[in-house]
């Protein structure tokens, strides 16, 4: 008995050290889980929490998110990781005089970031391959393509009504305020995004280089140089909201390595900058600042790709969606956000299981639609959900995941007949689908690119113009009038 008792006491003494270790593991695990939950930010600050629905009917991302915006603890409001909120921009730093050769080289690399004109092999078919007249939305198609610095106006059968073309070097040469010309700048071979005015004028973005305006005959009206990229939105009074960026060192984010800092720039109708808001500042100054811990330490930290002015139709349900605030999509954080331009602050944000998303947009019915580039088992999908209750409304995935994929770019537009116009940029395709997911119109870009024309030219966006859109200035209309 004595020996047994001594053996039991020995075992107990040997195991005592395990108890504090197990307790410590539990505490660390709980803290890590709580921190992870905090970093998935959603909804408008001040709204009531809603239980995240993880059922099949919930939008992508609900299962990994909380509906309560993260509150930044007071102890985090000093330096934390790579960033801090207090004194965000007060560090003085002359990045032109104090940069090392390595830093200067990295800044030049970041400035040259851009998209390829094409990356997928040329398919066997091209042009309009599907056209169900009775079920498509009538109108002309205005689109930009990777093989030429220009845009095309085309009818539903693929007949070209008008073309615009104006090269970057041509615009650069004509401008007295031109910057130093970088060798073979990416983005100079095509218009990344374009906007068509009713008189035939076009606004166009050379990705990372410039924004310009040409008339219906492609004559240059004005050009503004800068890091303009991805997207623009034009107001009724001619004011332009456009994404821009700057490659530089932001000491309060990373004092050693350059970043690409994204901005929302506001231009007047002549291309003169009126204001700009840093998306980095807007996020750092907000309830969602903790998301910066998920950002890369340097380089293209955000890759913001969408800018859309809100019209206030959802303000009564989500105050952050008031008219004048701006909706953006931040690819590198898988984030949809609303920016208050006056307060320089993100006032609403949503992350989810979507991957590298593009073109979040508010629909006429108050829902939100998003091009999810890589969230469908590595393939793409378009999703529509209610931003108020986060319930899934509609998805398009194609018949099989490989059938629909665009790792980069992509766009989606809801049409008046309730069909959806989708652009699969990488594969140079655009198609119109019914609410049931049936393709009733498909266009495959006949243009090719690459040194040996081995790639189909990307289609960056297609806009279906309403039938009432005036086009009497187009070459086809003028030819028919003769």
Regions found by a protein language model. Give the residues of each.
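N-terminal Sec-pathway targeting helices
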Residues: 7-24
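Histidine-/acidic-rich catalytic cores in large beta-rich domains
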Residues: 20, 29-482
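N-terminal intrinsically disordered, acidic low-complexity segments at the extreme N-terminus
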Residues: 1-4
């Amino acid at each position: 008995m004595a020996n047994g008792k001594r053996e039991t006491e020995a075992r107990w003494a040997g195991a005592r050290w395990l108890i504090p270790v197990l307790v410590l593991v539990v505490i660390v695990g709980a803290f890590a889980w709580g921190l992870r939950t905090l970093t998935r930010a959603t909804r408008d600050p001040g709204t009531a929490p809603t239980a995240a629905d993880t059922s099949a009917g919930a939008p992508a991302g609900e299962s990994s998110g909380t509906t309560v915006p993260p509150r930044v603890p007071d102890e985090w409001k000093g330096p934390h990781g790579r960033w801090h909120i207090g004194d965000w921009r007060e560090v003085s730093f002359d990045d032109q005089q104090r940069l090392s050769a390595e830093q200067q080289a990295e800044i030049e690399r970041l400035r040259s970031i851009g998209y390829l004109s094409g990356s997928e092999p040329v398919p066997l078919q091209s042009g309009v391959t599907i056209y169900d007249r009775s079920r498509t939305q009538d109108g002309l198609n205005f689109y930009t393509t990777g093989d030429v610095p220009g845009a095309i106006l085309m009818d539903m059968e693929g007949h070209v009504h008008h073309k615009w073309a104006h090269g970057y070097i041509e615009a650069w040469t004509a401008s007295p305020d031109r910057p130093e010309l970088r060798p073979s700048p990416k983005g100079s071979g095509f218009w990344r995004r374009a906007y068509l005015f009713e008189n035939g004028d076009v606004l166009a973005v050379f990705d990372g280089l410039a924004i310009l305006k040409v008339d219906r005959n492609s004559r240059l009206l004005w050009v503004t140089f800068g890091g303009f990229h991805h997207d623009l939105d034009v107001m009724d009074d001619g004011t332009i909201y456009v994404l821009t960026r700057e490659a530089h060192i932001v000491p309060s984010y990373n004092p050693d390595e350059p970043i690409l800092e994204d901005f929302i720039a506001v231009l007047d109708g002549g291309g003169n900058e009126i204001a700009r808001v840093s998306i980095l500042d807007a996020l750092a100054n907000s309830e969602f600042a903790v998301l910066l811990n998920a950002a890369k330490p340097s380089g293209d930290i955000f890759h913001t790709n969408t800018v859309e002015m809100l019209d206030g139709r959802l303000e009564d349900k989500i105050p952050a969606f008031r008219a004048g605030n701006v909706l953006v999509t931040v690819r590198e954080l898988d984030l949809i956000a609303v920016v208050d331009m006056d307060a320089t602050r993100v006032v609403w944000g949503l992350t989810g299981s979507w991957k590298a998303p593009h073109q979040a947009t508010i629909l006429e019915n108050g829902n939100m639609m998003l091009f999810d580039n890589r969230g469908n088992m590595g393939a793409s999908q378009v999703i529509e959900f209610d931003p108020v209750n986060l319930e899934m409304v509609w998805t398009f995935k194609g018949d099989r995941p490989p059938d629909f994929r665009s790792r980069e770019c992509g766009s989606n537009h809801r049409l008046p007949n309730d069909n959806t116009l989708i652009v699969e940029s990488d594969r140079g395709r655009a198609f119109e689908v019914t609410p049931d997911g049936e393709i009733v119109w498909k266009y495959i870009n006949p243009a090719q690119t690459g040194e040996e024309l081995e790639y189909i030219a990307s289609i960056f966006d297609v806009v279906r113009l309403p039938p009432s859109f005036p086009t009497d200035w187009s070459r086809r209309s003028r030819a028919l009038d003769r």
